[in-house]
């Protein structure tokens, strides 16, 4: 994947976490990404150059190049093809389509597993470039994807996970992030893109006069969202970026965690927030209920309902921390990696 070792978003964190756990268990694991090598990794890492997606934010949307991520992935392929030696591997895995999937499935390649980190439409759509999708195994990150695809592909239902050794309850560290010491903090951890529905979050927080909305992330809508917040919640909005090592402290510094994506394939951020003992507020959707269980504050899709859920969640933070971290423990990466190991082994044996 192009983003490996360069950005720490959901899919990249998932692949690195799985690779680390599998390597720790004795498997030989190779990751190929565009970022620099990191000291102390338990897997083998090969760097293949790409052009950062931010350079493509103003480029046109075309078939095969539907957004800045598609352009970035295409720029990654020459380096990937140079680094990739099919004979050295028993199985390959990606969540990137089309370019990386096609490159890893070239003639003579080992069995290939596709993970629905970014959605399952490559697996079921017969339109445009999706008609050329293929894999020997499909890992579905939620039950909806699994039910839709299990008759067509060898499939497994395996969610994403969380490192419960790092993400755990603890004291707030607001000063570390330049956040106000007084008042309540609503945190979002999100790319600044349309599907994350940050404008809806801004409008909900506007109904909570003493709350500040903090959005950790980046993306093409950063300026547009800042301008909206200045009009709707002046003085009560922060945009920031934080390295992966600081994310547990950031979650602990919030009174509630808010995530309003309607079509996320999983949402690592839900289990990260719960593991830190921070109450979760989200839209009431089957996929969200499957992740948070009875521990989430789920609302219908109106600003008033979201604000009411935030109010309730922030009032229960201390009392709920134990139950939240207990729920998150069900998604520990060690257990998730065992499921990956079992499925990858079956794919190799049956292909």
Language-model segments: what does each one mean?
Residues 179-196, 202-205, 214:
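Conserved donor-binding/catalytic core segment of Leloir-type glycosyltransferases
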Residues 144, 161:
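Carbohydrate-associated surface elements
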Residues 226-242:
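Nucleotide-activated donor-binding/catalytic signature segment of Leloir-type glycosyltransferases, i.e.
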Residues 279-282:
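Short hydrophobic beta-strand element within catalytic cores of glycosyltransferases
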Residues 249-254:
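Short alpha-helical donor nucleotide-sugar binding micro-motif in glycosyltransferases
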């Amino acid at each position: 994947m192009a983003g490996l070792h360069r950005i720490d978003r959901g899919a990249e964190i998932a692949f690195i976490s799985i690779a680390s756990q599998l390597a720790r268990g004795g498997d030989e694991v190779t990751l190929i990404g565009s970022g620099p090598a990191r000291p102390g990794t338990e897997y083998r890492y090969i760097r293949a150059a790409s052009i950062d997606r931010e350079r493509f934010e103003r480029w046109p949307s075309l078939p095969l190049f539907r957004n800045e991520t598609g352009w970035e992935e295409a720029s990654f392929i020459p380096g990937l093809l140079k680094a990739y030696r099919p004979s050295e591997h028993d199985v390959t895995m990606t969540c990137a389509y089309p370019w990386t999937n096609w490159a890893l499935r070239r003639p003579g390649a080992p069995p290939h597993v596709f993970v629905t980190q970014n959605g399952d439409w490559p697996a079921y759509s017969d339109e445009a470039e999706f008609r050329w999708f293929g894999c020997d195994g499909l890992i579905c990150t939620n039950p909806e994807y699994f039910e839709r695809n299990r008759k067509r592909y060898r499939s497994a239902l395996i969610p994403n996970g969380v490192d419960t050794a790092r993400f755990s309850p603890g004291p707030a560290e607001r000063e570390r992030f330049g956040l106000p010491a007084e008042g309540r903090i609503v945190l979002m951890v999100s790319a600044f893109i349309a599907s994350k529905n940050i404008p809806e979050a801004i409008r909900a927080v506007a109904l909570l006069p003493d709350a500040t909305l903090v959005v950790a992330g980046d993306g093409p809508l950063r300026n547009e969202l800042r301008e909206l917040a200045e009009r709707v919640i002046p003085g009560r909005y922060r945009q920031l970026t934080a390295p992966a090592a600081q994310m547990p402290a950031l979650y602990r510094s919030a009174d509630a965690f808010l995530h309003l994506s309607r079509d996320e394939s999983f949402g690592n951020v839900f289990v990260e927030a719960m593991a830190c003992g921070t109450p979760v507020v989200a839209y009431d959707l089957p996929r969200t209920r499957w992740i948070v269980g009875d521990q989430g504050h789920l609302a219908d899709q109106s600003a008033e309902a979201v604000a009411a859920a935030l109010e309730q969640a922030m009032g229960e933070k201390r009392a709920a921390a134990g139950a939240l971290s207990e729920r998150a423990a069900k998604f520990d990466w060690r257990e998730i990696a065992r499921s990956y190991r079992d499925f990858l082994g079956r794919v190799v044996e049956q292909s």
